[in-house]
């Protein structure tokens, strides 16, 4: 069973934080070669703080995926780290949350679930369920072109707000990730096609999905 749940930075155990930060280093530094700061084999930054909430996907006690949420009213990567990568960045007004540090650990997923699995789409769905549960207007995030393609293929009805250039002169995008019924239904349909999960049980958080 894959369980995805939300937990605040303040309530995370040191062991679980270390596990997440180590997996983030594996993804963002070792695999993607992003310009991130790493200490003692872990990747973390100033946005991992008391204003942060994480979604954690856990299988057999091990984290296999995660994403970080920060309410847009607090310091975040859109208004901080990435702001200079856009010309006159225009952030929509409203009760939004920013998402960042999205990852699915390939090795752990392969070992614990197998190669054909809906782990990524399930984490997308959990993001929608979280935003709906806490009554946010939607999710704002900045992504690379490969991540943009992945989101589009999932069926999520995303929209591009603005395009910028990263420090590597690669295209990046400020996106609005909506929490509408159509988007949620599209993701649920993808998951039910690959698992024995029932549609109604996928509309909650914590999110439980029967996986091998």
Swiss-Prot record:
GO BP annotations, alphabetical order: quorum sensing; signal transduction
Signal peptide from the UniProt entry: none
Molecular function per GO: N-acyl homoserine lactone synthase activity
Catalytic activity: a fatty acyl-[ACP] + S-adenosyl-L-methionine = an N-acyl-L-homoserine lactone + S-methyl-5'-thioadenosine + holo-[ACP] + H(+)
Lineage: superkingdom: Bacteria
Keyword GTP-binding applies: no
Keywords, in A-Z order: Autoinducer synthesis, Quorum sensing, S-adenosyl-L-methionine, Transferase
SS bond list: none
Tagged with keyword S-adenosyl-L-methionine: yes
Enzyme Commission number(s) of this protein: 2.3.1.184
EC category name: transferase
Annotated function: Required for the synthesis of OHHL (N-(3-oxohexanoyl)-L-homoserine lactone), an autoinducer molecule which binds to the EchR transcriptional regulator.
Family: Belongs to the autoinducer synthase family.
The protein's name: Acyl-homoserine-lactone synthase
Species of provenance: Dickeya chrysanthemi (Pectobacterium chrysanthemi)
């Amino acid at each position: 069973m894959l369980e995805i749940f939300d937990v605040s930075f303040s309530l995370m155990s040191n062991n679980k934080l270390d596990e997440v930060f180590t997996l983030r280093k594996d993804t963002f530094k070792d695999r993607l070669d992003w310009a991130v700061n790493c200490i003692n084999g872990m990747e973390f930054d100033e946005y991992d703080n008391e204003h942060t909430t994480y979604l954690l996907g856990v299988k057999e006690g091990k984290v296999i995926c995660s994403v970080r949420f920060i309410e847009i009213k607090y310091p975040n990567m859109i208004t901080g780290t990435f702001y200079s990568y856009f010309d006159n960045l225009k952030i929509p007004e409203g009760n939004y949350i920013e998402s960042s540090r999205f990852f699915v650990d390939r090795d752990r997923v392969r070992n614990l679930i197998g190669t054909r699995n809906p782990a990524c789409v399930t984490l997308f769905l959990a993001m929608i369920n979280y935003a709906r549960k806490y009554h946010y207007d939607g999710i704002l995030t900045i992504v690379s072109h490969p991540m943009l393609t992945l989101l589009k293929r999932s069926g999520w009805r995303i929209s591009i707000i603005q395009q910028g250039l990263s420090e590597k002169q690669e295209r990046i995008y400020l996106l609005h990730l909506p929490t509408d019924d159509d988007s949620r239904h599209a993701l649920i349909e993808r998951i039910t096609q690959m698992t024995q999960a029932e549609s109604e049980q996928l509309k909650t958080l914590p999110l439980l999905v029967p996986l091998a």
